[in-house]
Amino acid sequence: LVYADDVPATDDPVVANIRAAGGIVLCKTNTPEFGAGGNSRNDVHGATGNPFDPTKTCGGSSGGSAVALATGMAPLATGSDYGGSLRTPSSFCGVVGFRPSPGLVPSVDKAAALTPWGVIGPMGRSVEDAHLLLLAQADYDKRDPFSGDDYARLPEALSGIDLASVRVAISADLGCAPVDSNIRKTFAERVGTFRGVFAEAQDRDPDLGPQIHDVFEILRGLTFLTSHHDRLKKTPDKLGPNVTYHTQRGLERSAADVAWAQVEQGKIMKRYMALFDEVDVLIAPAASVSPFPHSQWHPTEMNGEKLDNYMRWLAISYGITMALTVSASIPCGVDHLGMPFGIQVAGPNGSDAIVLEIAHSLERHLAANKATARPLPNLNKLAGKGKPKAMA
């Protein structure tokens, strides 16, 4: 509601980069308020349904982008990612989302400039398409303290990589995330179809540690406090429950809490990076649940156990964020309910090019198997028409 009637006078720098590269900007798509949460609904535009079942969520926060891609409304789309904001909707809608290293795509509007966890990235219907958009998005911008010349090292085109030379770690839950039992089963089945193509595939969790949830809660609260404290004081009636929750959590923390979380986050990152002394990438589910009804803000329980807060079901995503890593979410068939299922291919910070190459090659391998190929929504059914029409 805060920006219900707002029309920006200028483009965001990333949009300006896309235009400068020859991109044609079509529209804006729906998100949850200020990108808070994994369900794209808000009090201005309502909820965006999933193209495979409009009664269910498309994910969030970049849910509208994922739907536009899945239904053919747009060939490319931008997304953002803090707790999985482009990876979750990519998984829920059967498209590709890429979380790049901090600073690769400049972000200049953060209230707290020295926070690297929220990034901007590309989304597409294939890894190649996402890479194409990344080339347009990525650039140096002196207003982003994490920006540098890494963009210059991105390949102009993806050539792929021999998966038989790649070592992978496979983790169903990152060693810390609640994951629905049916999603675990689907993940195990899908991994069984492709683990043999790699040079080495070991079942191994990254060492993210038991404090990761508290670390995330504190640092996310800090981020929301820097952006929304004044709004919470002046116009609390215009803020939804998710933004209010994290801003209030930020107010409850002390400087000592924030200092502790900063130190622990550094330890998490270093332990995670050590994994890549022995493997090239980590493969995990891209979402912990099947898409749920968009009428509910978020899952409140999993496997019969209550979830602590509205973000806990996203730990499979924010665990990756807290490690400051690169991650590509790619489609991998459908789950037990016939909804899109995705996996994430993650690497260490700075490994954008190699993660894209591996994800591209794995995507091609998955496309050859009906059980793991990218699913397509029934557009005629969505439009109330007859037989489904194939979409490229």
What are these regions (language model features)?
Residues 99-185, 189, 364-392:
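A short helix-breaking turn/cap at a secondary-structure junction
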Residues 1-4, 44, 147, 260, ...:
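Short, surface-exposed loop/helix-turn segments at secondary-structure junctions
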Residues 271-274, 305-330:
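Small-aliphatic-rich amphipathic alpha-helix that forms the alpha element of a beta-alpha
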Residues 11-19, 155, 181-205, 229-234, ...:
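Acyltransferase
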Residues 18, 46, 130, 194, ...:
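Conserved hydrophobic/aromatic pocket- or pore-lining residues that grip, position, or stack substrates
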Residues 1-82, 192, 270, 274-275:
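Gly/Ser-rich catalytic/binding loops embedded in alpha/beta enzyme cores
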Residues 122, 339-348, 355-356:
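Short, well-ordered beta-strand elements
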Residues 1, 160-171, 218-273, 285, ...:
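Short helix-loop capping/hinge segments that flank enzyme active sites or metal/cofactor-binding pockets
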